[in-house]
Amino acid sequence: MGIVVIGAVFVDIKGYPLSTYIPGGRNAGRIEQVHGGVSRNVAEDIANVELRPTFVGLVDDTGMGQDVIDKLDNHKVNTRYIQKVPDGMGTWLAIFDNDGDVHAAISKRPDTTPLTTLLEKKGDEIFKDCDAIAI
């Protein structure tokens, strides 16, 4: 099975002003929404160097959760051990200033409790042929 990566999935929502950023004011700008989470990023990066990692994690039981799974599948990440659960993903909302620095951010952490049950039930299967684990 090679490398097993265990961890959280986040959706990063990033706002960038089109003109001078006004703290506390209304700012026109562009907004990006990307899949994130350090562990998810690591699994995708490992796959990008043509290794075939297994990702063990949680996603929301929504279309966005399915999008995360689909993108990892497209990168040839084994997604068999990703569970869809309510509140399975975190969210990071960040506002950047004109210099590209984070001016404000709010982070909602996911409930990772279901990972314990998944590892108790399928841990032997997940790790039996693994060479390395990244948490």
Language-model regions, residue ranges each:
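Glycine-rich phosphate/adenosyl-contacting loop at the front of the ribokinase-like
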Residues: 1-56, 65-67
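Structural motif
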Residues: 2, 131-132
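Conserved N-terminal subdomain of the carbohydrate kinase-like
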Residues: 23-26, 48-131
